[in-house]
Structures are given as C-alpha cells and as structure tokens.
Amino acid sequence: MNRPSLKHFYIKSFGCQMNSYDGERMSELLESQGMKAAEEAATADLVVLNTCHIREKAAEKVYSEIGRLRRPDGSSPMIALAGCVAQAEGAEVLARTKMVDIVVGPQAYHHLPELIEKAASGKVVDIDMPLESKFDALPERRQVGASAFLTVQEGCDKFCTYCVVPYTRGAEVSRPWSRIVKEAHALVDKGAREITLLGQNVNAWTGEDEAGRSQGLDGLIRALAKIDGLERIRYTTSHPNDMTEGLIEAHGEIDKLMPFLHLPVQSGSNRILKAMNRAHTAESYLTLMNRLKEVRPDIALSGDFIVGFPGESEEDFQATLDLISEVGYSLAFSFAYSPRPGTPAADMDNQIDPEISRERLQRLQALLNQQQFDFNQQTIGRKATVLIERKGKKADQMIGKSPWLQSVIIEAPVAIGDLVEVTLTDAGPNSVKGQFLDQKQFATA
C-alpha cells in the first residue's frame, strides 16, 4: 500500500454477527498491507463504517456517525462506508454526504486496498457481488480468541417481504467444504476452542465432501467435530424451512454441538407469516421445536420476532404471545416493524400506527425478558462447562459462556481460553454466576 499518510485505521461494525466477522477480516486485510489498528476513530487516518440495513434506525445511525467523524479543525479521516447500507444505496451515499470517500459492499471488501489507492484521486464505489473471490483474496486469520466466527454461507433466496438481505447480500452461496475445514483447522491452531458457523441462512449450506458426496450442514458439523482441540460448535442464523431431520438429529448425537439454537419465527400468526412470505406455519415451527426438545431435552431455544407488521391485528399479536409461551425461550430478539425501501412490505396497505407497534413491542419484550430470567433460574444447580472469554469488571472476575450461551461470571484465577467445570449458583436477568468444582479440571488452551 503506497500511502504513507494512511498509517492507522479504525473499523466500527453495526448489526449482526456476520458484520462482526466481516469487520475482523477487513482488519486483517488492512494489517496485511502494513496499517495498524487505532484505538479510536479520532486517531485514525482511515475509518471504515461496516453498516447494517435491516432497520431504518440502524441505517440512519450510520449517517449520524459519519457527521461525528469531522474533527475540530474541520478535517476528517478517509471514510469508507462498507456493509449493507453501502450495497443498498451505492452511489447515492456520495450524493447524500460529501464526507464518504469509498463505498464498498459486503461482497467486495477484499478490494479495499485498491479502493484506498483509487480514493486518492476521487471517490469510488464497488458493490460487485463475486462472493467466493472475496474469501480467496483475504489473508489468513492472524489472531483469534477462544471463540471464533467462521462464515460458511452467505446470501438468502427466501425473499421475506420485509427483508433487504436478498438485495444486499445476494443469492444463497455456500463456501466449499475443503475451504471451510481448512479455515476451521487454522482457527483451532491459533487458539479457538469454539467455532460459530455463520450464514444468513446457515442451515441452507450444501456442498460436497472430500469424497464427492453431497452434504448438508449436519454433515459439515460432523466433520468439524472430529478436529482435535475444537471443543464446541455453534451455528447461526437458521431458517425453519432448512431445518432438516439430519440436522435435528445432530443435536442429539454430537457432543461438541452446543445445546443452543437460534431459529427465528417472526410471528405466531399464520396470516402474518403468509404475508411475510415465510413459507412455514406456526404449527410447523412448533413441530420443529418439539422435535429438537425430544432429541436434546436440555436445548436452549432462541428466536426473532417482528411486531407491527402491516395488517397485524390484536388477534395476530396474541398468537405471537401464545407461541412464545408455548416454546419457552432462553433468549430472543424483538423488533418493531421498520419499512425498508424496495421491499414488498413497504408498499403494503394497513401499515400499523407506530404507537401501537411500540406498545406491542413492550408487551412482547416483557414476556421474553421474563422467560430469559426464568430459564437462567432453572439452570441454578446445574453443572456446566464454561469457556472463559474475557475479563470481568473486578480484578479477580472472569466471564465465560455456558453451553446454553449464558454469560457466566466466575471469580477465580483462570485464563481466557480455559474450559472450566462449574456449578451454576445464582441467576440474574442477563447472566448467571458459577462456582468452581475443582481447579484440577481446568483445561488451558
């Protein structure tokens, strides 16, 4: 990179875990070009805003962030707008703000070094979508934590009427088996004890193994489970229609596959699910949930919910509350419907009054919060293996993850990357506390 004035970069990622993964890869890419990460945007020569376009509020937040990058003397760093806002708005970004120098989509960020060079002569836009060449061009992972993300699939073919993902991430594409397995080995060699497989519809992954046999995500997970040193496997985000019997059975057969599943449903009303083009019913979703509980009785379940979708009645909303009550979630995410330009739902009649949506969101979130607290309380007394991931606020405090994705607070002389056996002793709304069983059971990576 022949730009000595650009020595330090800062990346801020918004939104989903896929964006977090992309942010990590962009950081590694820029470091491979000789740049160093800055602690804050104020000291960076290049700022990359890795954006989310799922909701209007998330997209607008980015433009506010751009404005804050102007420095007291009137100058600003080189600014690259990456991610899904960049993909959705393209050159319109440059018309909306003069501060952005580079617009780069989520399938083109491997071109970032070249785009930085071009930006010296003028503003540039790259929103091409050649998915696999992106992974080919990225450098090897350098540093990873105890838990690492690994993208195996991108894009979406479902075209839910409220969602921009098919337009910003493109069609469903699965990375080849061999490259996934190779990257997983590399992550473990660098210290990862847990890998989370990522995809917009991760359970839609398909490919051929080394013997040329067709495989689904369950086959890939079975292969990864054989890697020595890899202790835990997770995957997210899934679609109910791609939840195969083989994948369900994997939850009961593979010890390394953690007893946690995030499976969005969005609504408990069949009428609203049809309007959303979800292509499943509340009943079929509940059947999946019950089957998962059969094969893995201790599984913790998570979901996503949208309230205030166009035409949603109080009866429709009550159906969602009823579904939540029947499933019993350990964790879930709820959102008020946000019209996204270019999606069919944005042009539907019977848009819901925002005040009604907010009131429903409060009621729904109260139920979800109670369920999360109840789940945490139900785990008190359980023995659990906890993966230590970071330091806590106190000097002797460490925080790790339980198999059920709970944050576990531990006070003991352990290190990041340790897998420790504890008894869960106390529960709060968002975390639990753990007591060591025996220090001899510590296992340091």
From Swiss-Prot:
Entry keyword Cell membrane: no
One GO cellular component, as annotated: cytosol
Domain TRAM span(s) in chain numbering: 377-438
InterPro entries reported in the protein's UniProt record: Elp3/MiaA/NifB-like_rSAM (IPR006638), Methylthiotransferase (IPR005839), Methylthiotransferase_CS (IPR020612), Methylthiotransferase_N (IPR013848), Methylthiotransferase_N_sf (IPR038135), MiaB_methiolase (IPR006463), rSAM (IPR007197), rSAM_horseshoe (IPR023404)
Molecular function in Gene Ontology: 4 iron, 4 sulfur cluster binding; metal ion binding; N6-isopentenyladenosine methylthiotransferase activity
SMART domains from the UniProt entry: Elp3
Disulfide pattern: none
Subcellular location: Cytoplasm
Reactions performed catalytically: N(6)-dimethylallyladenosine(37) in tRNA + (sulfur carrier)-SH + AH2 + 2 S-adenosyl-L-methionine = 2-methylsulfanyl-N(6)-dimethylallyladenosine(37) in tRNA + (sulfur carrier)-H + 5'-deoxyadenosine + L-methionine + A + S-adenosyl-L-homocysteine + 2 H(+)
Cofactors: [4Fe-4S] cluster
CDD domains cross-referenced by the UniProt entry: Radical_SAM
Known partners and oligomeric status: Monomer.
HAMAP family attached to this UniProt entry: tRNA_metthiotr_MiaB
Protein family (similarity comment): Belongs to the methylthiotransferase family. MiaB subfamily.
Annotated PANTHER family: CDK5 REGULATORY SUBUNIT-ASSOCIATED PROTEIN 1, MITOCHONDRIAL TRNA METHYLTHIOTRANSFERASE CDK5RAP1
Protein name, as recorded: tRNA-2-methylthio-N(6)-dimethylallyladenosine synthase
